[in-house]
Amino acid sequence: MKKNKRTLIFALTLTALSALASCSGGGNSENPDNPGDGGGTTTNSKHQYTATKRVNEYLVKEGRTNYKIVISEESDTQLNYAKNELNTLFGEATGVTFDFVYDTKVTYSDSATYISLGQNAYLTSAGLDKEVSFSTYGRDGARIITQGKSIFIFGATNFGTLYGVYDFLKITLNFECYYEDCYTLDKNVKDLSMYDFNVIDIPDVAYRQRRGLLYPTASQNQMFPYRMRVTDDVNMLFLPIYENGPGSAYNTNHNSFFYFPEKQYKTTDPDFYSVAGNQLCFTARGVPERFEKMTDIAAAKIEESLTFNSVAKAPTYTTAFLGQNDIQDYCSCEACTKVRESHYGSACAPIIIFMNRVGKKVNEWMALPENAPYKRNLNYSFFAYLTTIVPPFKQKADGTFEYSQDIIPDEGVNLMPYVASMNFDYGRPFYSDENKEAREILKTWGNFYPGAWSWTYGGFYNDYITFFDIYSFYEDFHSYLKNYKYSLSFEQVKNDQRGADPGFGGLSNYVLCKKNWDSSLPMDTLINDYITNVYEDAAPAMREMFQKLRLWFAKLIEKHGIGAGGQMQGDISSNAKYYDGIGFINELFDLCDDAYKAIEIYKKDEAKYKRLSTYIDIEWLIPAKVAISCFEAKYLASDFIAMKTKFKDICIELKIKDIKEFTSINSYLESLGV
């Protein structure tokens, strides 16, 4: 097959997701994998927090303010959140709340004292709409500008406005959110200076997938994901593919057999399936007529979903996704083997060729006048995962690519890989030698498809009540995504856990949210800030507990090598070989006891004591799970029953959902017999 050389920037038609990502600066001179090979140059232009206090000018003076909030009469959810969060948190800090006025009722003047939220007529009357390039902000980028005596907080959308409010509160009142019920905020502020703001704050990763604790339970703070600036859910982006028509079962993830249900096609069209029968054959055994029939069926499935989920009904769907089954296998037929061998051994090549053909057919269908209500700028996405992780192209040292022409999409077909990197060792630093090959693969996909999506891991998926050290790996990961222009990141970690996440899951959630937004933030600083502000007087003991767990984990990785791929499936807390006796577990219990003692001074403040003791309870579950599973003989019967009772009570009270991936904790709690 003819090979072509291609420069780094090529003429793929990109969707809005891709365009947003292309605003990112690239490159990192400290990282050995970026010798100027297409990553660009590092810039801090996305995060500028210039704010200078004015002399003898005040937002609040002696507990009073002259300022009002200006908003548009045409509001949306995010703008409502922005005004409510500003008023609520500002009021909590100062005792002052703002009156509201609609933008059509006021006109800008240098002496007017307003805080303007979002794009509105007041911003236009100040002339700022002509001075700002909204296209560079993406969906979430925030801008804060002082002009005259007015402050303008806005973005290209009101997501940016909301995040700008959080920046404003951070600068003026030290607001920082750590956990669903824990944030810092200055209190009893009677005098607050006016600032000259010139703030730009644009996320390094444009779209950030929610996970775990970012899905609050009904009793938790529903603003938590917004305060952490992570609100995306790919289920709101992916068209559902229905097994047997709208209203039937559907899948948006590993959904290839929803496109081609076995009951419908396995007997009549066996060539649609792999030789082993557990995946699709994306070449239909190399028979052109069968390939056309297969792509017709897949296109019809997408068209069916587009029709049922019209733009007016479901505007968030941007992507038609076809995901292989979640197993280490691919079709071994002669035709698929030939395609792989002619595309650098990539099992993803047949999928890309298939999706390009499907995308062309769906685009032609959407272009028909009668289908105007269903027309979207649609991505056609696929997994690069497990056996399909290797790209079907090769990047050369000069930044150009060698590839086969048949993987280049037809005009208007937006192909988008979802790179699910099970091939990393998440227990080791991102720049470790063990992760070199996986880094190269991630970089190559990102360079060939600017705006690609990333799915990563880092957890023991058969054991949710234990500790996994993600911090060395994710220290440098998000800057790599930024450099190579990825537009979405999903760090799975313990994605389906709810209520609470033992193993310092609150901390891991915090640092992942922060690094997604600004990848330059130092990991150690984030860790220390979280522990200091969440645990307060118990911080020294909890910091030592965290450090001991990191040391234990490092030994675990070196001795057992269980931080990579399928090796992350181990049941850790139920296996005594990982602990070398009960001594380490007793050390963790002792540190929890020290932490409980440190907060006894707050017992008269019932709410605060309960909050702090709950944070300690969550991590107490780690040694308790090991002790219950492995060391019953080391305890008096009464002490062992008390331990199991406390374990069960904590899990029930906090509504902890899972004991391991896809498995409720309820059966385990019942098995405790207390």
Regions found by a protein language model. Give the residues of each.
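Bacterial N-terminal signal peptides that target proteins for export
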Residues: 1-10
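C-terminal motif of bacterial Sec signal peptides marking the signal peptidase cleavage site
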Residues: 19-22
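Acidic, contiguous N-terminal accessory segments
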Residues: 34-143, 189, 193-199
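Feature activates predominantly on carbohydrate-active enzymes
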Residues: 77, 82-85, 89, 93, ...
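Structured mid-domain segments that build the active-site/substrate or prosthetic-cofactor binding neighborhood
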Residues: 282, 286-296, 304-313, 433-552
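Aromatic-lined carbohydrate-recognition surfaces of secreted/lumenal glycan-active proteins
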Residues: 355-394, 451-461, 489-492
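Substrate-binding cleft/loops of secretory-pathway carbohydrate-active enzymes
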Residues: 380-422, 465-472, 501-507
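Catalytic domains of carbohydrate-active enzymes that cleave complex glycans
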Residues: 512-674
